[in-house]
Protein backbone atom coordinates (compact mmCIF):
# COMPACT_ATOMS: atom_id res chain seq x y z
CA UNK A 1 0.00 0.00 0.00
CA UNK A 2 1.02 3.56 -0.75
CA UNK A 3 -0.75 6.68 0.45
CA UNK A 4 -0.86 9.45 -2.17
CA UNK A 5 -1.64 12.98 -0.98
CA UNK A 6 -2.93 15.81 -3.17
CA UNK A 7 -0.77 18.17 -1.13
CA UNK A 8 -1.09 21.62 -2.72
CA UNK A 9 -3.81 22.76 -0.31
CA UNK A 10 -3.59 19.98 2.28
CA UNK A 11 -3.67 21.34 5.85
CA UNK A 12 -0.45 20.99 7.86
CA UNK A 13 -2.38 19.13 10.57
CA UNK A 14 -3.29 16.40 8.06
CA UNK A 15 0.34 16.10 6.94
CA UNK A 16 1.36 15.69 10.60
CA UNK A 17 -1.19 12.91 11.09
CA UNK A 18 0.02 11.21 7.91
CA UNK A 19 3.65 11.43 9.05
CA UNK A 20 2.77 9.72 12.33
CA UNK A 21 0.72 7.07 10.50
CA UNK A 22 3.59 6.41 8.07
CA UNK A 23 5.94 5.77 11.00
CA UNK A 24 3.46 3.65 12.94
CA UNK A 25 2.28 1.49 10.05
CA UNK A 26 5.51 1.65 8.00
CA UNK A 27 3.58 2.65 4.90
CA UNK A 28 4.99 4.98 2.22
CA UNK A 29 3.28 8.38 2.05
CA UNK A 30 3.89 10.52 -1.04
CA UNK A 31 2.94 14.21 -1.01
CA UNK A 32 2.37 15.44 -4.57
CA UNK A 33 2.34 19.19 -5.23
CA UNK A 34 3.39 21.77 -7.79
CA UNK A 35 5.49 23.54 -5.18
CA UNK A 36 8.47 22.49 -3.12
CA UNK A 37 7.38 20.72 0.07
CA UNK A 38 9.52 19.92 3.07
CA UNK A 39 8.92 16.56 4.66
CA UNK A 40 10.36 15.12 7.86
CA UNK A 41 13.36 12.84 7.45
CA UNK A 42 11.78 9.42 7.18
CA UNK A 43 12.10 6.38 4.96
CA UNK A 44 8.29 6.38 4.80
CA UNK A 45 7.59 9.91 3.62
CA UNK A 46 8.57 11.72 0.44
CA UNK A 47 7.50 14.70 -1.63
CA UNK A 48 7.14 14.84 -5.40
CA UNK A 49 7.16 18.25 -7.05
CA UNK A 50 5.36 18.27 -10.39
CA UNK A 51 5.43 21.11 -12.94
CA UNK A 52 2.94 23.93 -12.48
CA UNK A 53 -0.23 23.56 -14.49
CA UNK A 54 -3.87 22.67 -14.28
CA UNK A 55 -4.37 19.23 -12.68
CA UNK A 56 -0.72 18.17 -13.17
CA UNK A 57 -0.52 16.87 -9.58
CA UNK A 58 -3.85 15.10 -10.05
CA UNK A 59 -2.61 13.43 -13.25
CA UNK A 60 0.52 12.22 -11.44
CA UNK A 61 -1.57 10.71 -8.65
CA UNK A 62 -3.98 9.03 -11.08
CA UNK A 63 -1.08 7.56 -13.07
CA UNK A 64 0.72 6.35 -9.94
CA UNK A 65 -2.03 5.02 -7.65
CA UNK A 66 -3.07 1.39 -7.95
CA UNK A 67 -5.80 -0.69 -6.27
CA UNK A 68 -4.79 -1.23 -2.66
CA UNK A 69 -3.45 2.34 -2.37
CA UNK A 70 -5.17 5.25 -0.63
CA UNK A 71 -5.51 8.77 -2.04
CA UNK A 72 -6.06 11.76 0.26
CA UNK A 73 -7.71 14.69 -1.53
CA UNK A 74 -10.42 17.32 -1.26
CA UNK A 75 -10.67 17.35 -5.07
CA UNK A 76 -13.89 15.51 -5.94
CA UNK A 77 -13.06 14.94 -9.65
CA UNK A 78 -9.68 13.46 -8.62
CA UNK A 79 -11.40 11.25 -6.05
CA UNK A 80 -13.88 10.10 -8.72
CA UNK A 81 -11.07 9.24 -11.10
CA UNK A 82 -9.09 7.15 -8.62
CA UNK A 83 -12.20 5.44 -7.23
CA UNK A 84 -13.00 4.52 -10.85
CA UNK A 85 -9.61 2.77 -10.94
CA UNK A 86 -10.45 0.80 -7.80
CA UNK A 87 -8.29 2.97 -5.52
CA UNK A 88 -9.59 4.01 -2.08
CA UNK A 89 -9.95 7.75 -1.47
CA UNK A 90 -10.81 10.05 1.41
CA UNK A 91 -10.89 13.75 2.09
CA UNK A 92 -8.74 15.43 4.69
CA UNK A 93 -11.95 15.95 6.65
CA UNK A 94 -12.33 12.17 6.96
CA UNK A 95 -15.02 11.67 4.32
CA UNK A 96 -14.51 8.32 2.59
CA UNK A 97 -15.21 8.30 -1.14
CA UNK A 98 -16.28 5.01 -2.67
CA UNK A 99 -18.12 3.72 -5.73
CA UNK A 100 -21.45 4.15 -3.92
CA UNK A 101 -20.93 7.77 -2.84
CA UNK A 102 -18.67 9.42 -5.38
CA UNK A 103 -21.32 9.89 -8.08
CA UNK A 104 -23.52 11.90 -5.73
CA UNK A 105 -20.56 13.98 -4.49
CA UNK A 106 -19.52 14.70 -8.09
CA UNK A 107 -23.06 15.75 -9.02
CA UNK A 108 -23.25 18.05 -5.99
CA UNK A 109 -19.85 19.55 -6.79
CA UNK A 110 -20.88 20.19 -10.41
CA UNK A 111 -24.13 21.82 -9.29
CA UNK A 112 -22.24 24.13 -6.91
CA UNK A 113 -19.81 25.00 -9.74
CA UNK A 114 -22.76 25.96 -11.96
CA UNK A 115 -24.24 28.14 -9.22
CA UNK A 116 -20.91 29.90 -8.72
CA UNK A 117 -20.53 30.40 -12.48
CA UNK A 118 -24.03 31.91 -12.50
CA UNK A 119 -23.00 34.49 -9.91
CA UNK A 120 -24.61 32.90 -6.86
CA UNK A 121 -22.53 33.44 -3.73
CA UNK A 122 -22.63 30.08 -1.97
CA UNK A 123 -19.58 30.63 0.20
CA UNK A 124 -16.83 28.11 0.65
CA UNK A 125 -16.02 25.29 2.99
CA UNK A 126 -15.63 26.03 6.68
CA UNK A 127 -12.11 26.46 8.02
CA UNK A 128 -10.35 23.21 8.89
CA UNK A 129 -10.92 22.68 12.60
CA UNK A 130 -10.40 20.31 15.50
CA UNK A 131 -13.46 18.21 14.59
CA UNK A 132 -12.11 17.80 11.03
CA UNK A 133 -8.70 16.80 12.36
CA UNK A 134 -10.29 14.20 14.63
CA UNK A 135 -12.55 12.87 11.84
CA UNK A 136 -9.58 12.52 9.49
CA UNK A 137 -7.42 10.79 12.11
CA UNK A 138 -10.25 8.35 12.90
CA UNK A 139 -11.00 7.61 9.23
CA UNK A 140 -7.30 7.09 8.46
CA UNK A 141 -6.87 4.81 11.47
CA UNK A 142 -9.89 2.74 10.38
CA UNK A 143 -8.47 2.47 6.84
CA UNK A 144 -5.07 1.42 8.16
CA UNK A 145 -6.59 -1.20 10.44
CA UNK A 146 -8.56 -2.64 7.48
CA UNK A 147 -5.34 -2.68 5.46
CA UNK A 148 -3.45 -4.44 8.26
CA UNK A 149 -6.14 -7.14 8.47
CA UNK A 150 -6.05 -7.78 4.71
CA UNK A 151 -2.26 -7.71 4.67
CA UNK A 152 -2.33 -10.60 7.09
CA UNK A 153 -4.73 -12.35 4.70
CA UNK A 154 -2.50 -11.91 1.67
CA UNK A 155 -2.82 -8.14 1.17
CA UNK A 156 -5.62 -8.23 -1.37
CA UNK A 157 -5.85 -5.05 -3.50
CA UNK A 158 -8.60 -2.53 -2.86
CA UNK A 159 -9.03 -3.56 0.75
CA UNK A 160 -8.49 -0.13 2.26
From Swiss-Prot:
InterPro entries linked to this entry: UPF0178 (IPR003791)
User: Would you say which domain of life the source belongs to?
Assistant: Bacteria
What start and end residues bound the annotated signal peptide? none
The family database entries (Pfam families) matched by this protein are listed as:
DUF188
Concerning its family, UniProt says: Belongs to the UPF0178 family.
Please name the HAMAP family in this protein's record.
Answer: UPF0178
What is the recorded name of this protein? UPF0178 protein BPP1051
- Native organism: Bordetella parapertussis (strain 12822 / ATCC BAA-587 / NCTC 13253)
Amino acid sequence: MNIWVDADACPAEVKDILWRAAQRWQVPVTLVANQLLRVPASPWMRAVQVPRGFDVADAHIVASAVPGDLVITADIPLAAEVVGKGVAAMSWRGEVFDAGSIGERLTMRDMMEELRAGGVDIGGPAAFGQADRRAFANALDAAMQRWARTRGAGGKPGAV
